[in-house]
Amino acid sequence: MNGEVESRLRKYLERDKNGLRRELLRVLLEGKKFTTSEIHDILSRRGYSISPRGVSAMVGLISARLGILKTELGEKNRYYLKSEYADLVRKIVEEFE
């Protein structure tokens, strides 16, 4: 299973034209739970130009295709990196720096 996740994560980052995908994964590596609005604010402060809907699409793709996020349902859903993937994600993100 981890081999499949690793392969998909590498392909995801290979298509990262401006570093936005890598930065989103760095945010998730902080180990907190975030709403898409909070992620949007963080990415905007770090100089990335993306709409709130764009952030939602990226988070949805990471959750559905890569399977490395957990969702805490509520009035506003909160997303966080599954702890078992933190080391793998960190290693691959560093390779793409």
UniProtKB/Swiss-Prot annotation:
Report the InterPro entries cross-referenced here: Uncharacterised_AF1218
Q: What is this protein called?
A: Uncharacterized protein AF_1218
**Could you tell me which species this protein originates from?**
Archaeoglobus fulgidus (strain ATCC 49558 / DSM 4304 / JCM 9628 / NBRC 100126 / VC-16)
What are the leading ranks of the lineage?
Answer: Archaea, Methanobacteriati, Methanobacteriota, Archaeoglobi, Archaeoglobales
